[in-house]
């Protein structure tokens, strides 16, 4: 019987190894085929179910991924990658407390797995974090992930125990003017905030697709920021080398009547066109319920129910105010909205008020109709110009109960972002469509309410 089990395990191990290699190289279709083969060959294998969960997660099918990870745990409760997978699903679904518990269980079972270690390091502090970083380096972890984790560690040392982005004004409702900006260089229309950094004014484009605050070099010098650690500023674009820069700490950041101490700010080395003095991601204000009233020219900030600033977020709850909201999935600063384009299966599009148009991936565009090369449309992001741009025929876009007919949509390759996040990004909901709504964003609970203007 042991001999039979060994024969059984050999082909399965080969299938999983080939599948994992395909998945790491973004061969999702091949990985999906091999995952199905593994489940057929070994339906009682925790490893087969766990790998199927990974492929489902990469496809953006989180409920199905969760089911596969749970099946893996049922067959083998000590299979660490399955707990890591459950943590990933819980985290993107705003089940914040559950995610920490799942990642902790995975780490306890296998503290040297690079993927598990990377997920757990961000939750450590002080000497524990330094020791874990050293182990991550020796575990042959992803160099890019290691670089980011080390930069965060350097930033933590510079803060010397102080909390970054500490709210010092009262945690109460506030209203901030939401200004329409028009770029003189690109004529692109955006909305932004007039903020005060270290006592000096700055105009920042409000971008739901951006991470934190990014300033241009001239603006950073004007407000007196000094380099604390190197930083990589990521975004769309085809430059082989990501935009470099540095992180700094501003003593004071004022956004209307809301004030923060020790605000972490990224400064981009590369010239940034059409973004005023910089960008501010709406996630900066994630401790509030954020309402973006584009037509009324204002941003409202309300306290989250049952929350005090500085507390760890609990598992998602839905307040009466947000009962009609759309459930979204959070990956760091990005909010992914379930959407449907044409007759394709449901996909995930980034909520992106900083995008000048709604964009879709070339993969999705090819799945729903004819695609033609478009050499007239110029796309540019934080990482430079996008080289290959395409145009579709007429398509219908559906999300949050809303339907819009489009006389063609712009498409480009989103594989870099999808690879970095570990799930399929099929496009961006840009400002022209988002401007039709008043948006209420709840980062804690992964909810966005789309209220159509009449």
Features from the language model and the residues they span:
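Acidic/polar, glycine-enriched structural segments that form the non-catalytic walls/loops
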Residues: 43
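Pepsin/retropepsin-fold aspartyl endopeptidases
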Residues: 13-24, 29-37, 47-51, 55-454
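Boundary at the C-terminal end of the N-terminal hydrophobic targeting segment
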Residues: 4-9
């Amino acid at each position: 019987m042991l001999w039979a089990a060994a024969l059984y395990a050999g082909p399965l191990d080969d299938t999983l190894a080939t599948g994992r290699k395909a998945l790491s190289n973004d061969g999702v279709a091949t990985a999906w085929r091999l995952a199905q083969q593994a489940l057929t060959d070994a339906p009682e294998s925790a490893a087969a179910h766990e790998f199927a969960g990974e492929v489902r997660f990469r496809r953006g099918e989180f409920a199905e991924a969760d089911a596969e990870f749970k099946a893996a745990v049922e067959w083998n409760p000590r299979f660490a990658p399955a707990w890591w997978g459950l943590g990933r699903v819980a985290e993107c679904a705003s089940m914040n407390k559950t995610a920490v518990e799942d990642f902790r269980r995975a780490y306890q079972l296998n503290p040297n797995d690079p993927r598990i270690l990377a997920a757990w390091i961000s939750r450590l502090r002080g000497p524990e974090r330094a020791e874990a970083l050293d182990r991550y380096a020796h575990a042959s972890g992803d160099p890019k992930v290691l670089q980011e984790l080390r930069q965060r560690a350097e930033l933590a040392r510079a803060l010397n125990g102080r909390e970054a982005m500490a709210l010092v004004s009262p945690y109460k409702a506030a209203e901030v003017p939401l200004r329409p900006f028009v770029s003189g260089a690109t004529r692109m229309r955006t909305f932004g905030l007039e903020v005060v950094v270290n006592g000096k004014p700055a105009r920042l484009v409000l971008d739901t697709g951006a991470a934190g605050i990014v300033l241009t070099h001239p603006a950073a010098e004007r407000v007196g920021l000094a380099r604390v650690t190197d930083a990589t500023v990521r975004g769309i674009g085809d430059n082989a080398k990501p935009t470099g820069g540095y992180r700094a700490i501003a003593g004071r950041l004022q956004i209307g009547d809301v004030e923060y101490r020790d605000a972490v700010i990224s400064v981009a080395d590369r010239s940034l066109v059409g973004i005023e003095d910089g960008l501010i991601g709406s996630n900066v204000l994630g401790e509030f319920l954020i309402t973006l009233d584009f037509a009324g020219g204002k941003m409202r900030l309300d306290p989250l129910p049952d929350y005090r600033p500085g507390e760890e977020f609990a598992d998602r709850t839905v307040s009466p105010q947000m009962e009609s909201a759309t459930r979204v999935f959070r990956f760091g600063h990005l909010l992914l909205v379930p959407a449907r384009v044409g007759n394709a299966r449901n996909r995930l599009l980034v909520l992106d008020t900083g995008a000048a148009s709604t964009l879709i991936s070339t993969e999705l565009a090819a799945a729903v109709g004819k695609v033609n090369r478009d050499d007239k449309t110029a796309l540019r992001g934080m990482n430079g110009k996008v080289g290959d741009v395409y145009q579709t025929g007429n398509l219908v876009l559906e999300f949050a109960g809303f339907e819009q007919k489009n006389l063609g949509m712009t498409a480009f390759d989103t594989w870099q972002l999808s690879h970095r996040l570990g799930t399929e990004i099929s496009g961006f909901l840009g400002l022209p469509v988002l401007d039709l709504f008043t948006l209420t964003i709840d980062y804690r609970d992964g909810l966005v309410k789309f209220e159509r203007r009449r």
